[in-house]
Amino acid sequence: MPKINTSSSGWLADISLFYEKRGTNTKLVHREQVGPLMVQRPFYPETGIAHTYLLHPPGGVVGGDQLNINIHVSPQAHSLLTTPGATKFYRSSGATSSQTQNLTVESDGFLEWLPQENIFFPDSQAQLKTQVELHKNAHFIGWEMNCFGRPVLDEIFENGFVTGRTNIKVDDQLLLSESMYIDSIDEIKHAAGMRHYPMLGNLYIYPASEALEEKLRTLIDENFHEQPELFGSSNPICGITEIDGLLVIRYLGHQTEPMMACFSTLWQHTRQHWLGKLPEVPRIWAT
């Protein structure tokens, strides 16, 4: 594994958002920010749910840059966060960029963490960390989508590296701890790695139930076998696992749009299962 150089030569972007239930709505009651990470004012296409767009630096992330994102959802609050576009990690001359996400949801709180994909350019060096802290009565659905190289341009991730660590805890009990290490094209080719697929996605859902798991398994089977046009002709791989009340869906593919379509479909039906109706899909995804 190459040495990770966390040089301070880049800029620091740090944002903390605190959501609370106020009357019938969820409000962004406090924010702290340093650097170019920012949010638009929350809006309410659905009653009681604060939709928020997290705006990443428009110029992308370069070596030495640090992004820190902290989200706190109080009891009975309900927040949905997404991004207006992909987060791009550009080539590095030696310093490692980092993105750290800390997501906390209290009792009866509800967080939907739905960012668009990360794109890692060849020769980029990046370190990703995600820490999710949930109360046992919280609801959480979140995903991460990572693209190594730019397959649409036949550009492969020949050099560089990306490391990742995701921890999910419920009432301070660790349910999931997994790491990712991608070191150029060799790891993408390896059968124990990504099997020649340049895109890797993970979708996390808590709490799980047998009924919800069965519903999502059926959706995956129907979409892959009966609607292949939805997922393109690149033969993606998608599977679902239950871990101590947490559902984990993993996806390997060649294109962003099919992965987004898959995860969006599973998210919408999960929300319907929990709340009895389909959600309003963020309009920014259609632009």
Swiss-Prot record:
Its main location: cytoplasm. Coiled coil: none annotated. Keywords: Chaperone, Cytoplasm, Nickel insertion. The lineage of its organism: Bacteria, Pseudomonadati, Pseudomonadota, Gammaproteobacteria, Vibrionales. InterPro entries: UreD. GO terms for molecular function: nickel cation binding. Belongs to the UreD family. It is found in: Cytoplasm. This is Urease accessory protein UreD. It comes from the Bacteria. One of its GO terms (cellular component) is cytoplasm. UreD, UreF and UreG form a complex that acts as a GTP-hydrolysis-dependent molecular chaperone, activating the urease apoprotein by helping to assemble the nickel containing metallocenter of UreC. The UreE protein probably delivers the nickel. It comes from Aliivibrio fischeri (strain ATCC 700601 / ES114). Required for maturation of urease via the functional incorporation of the urease nickel metallocenter. The keyword RNA-binding does not apply.
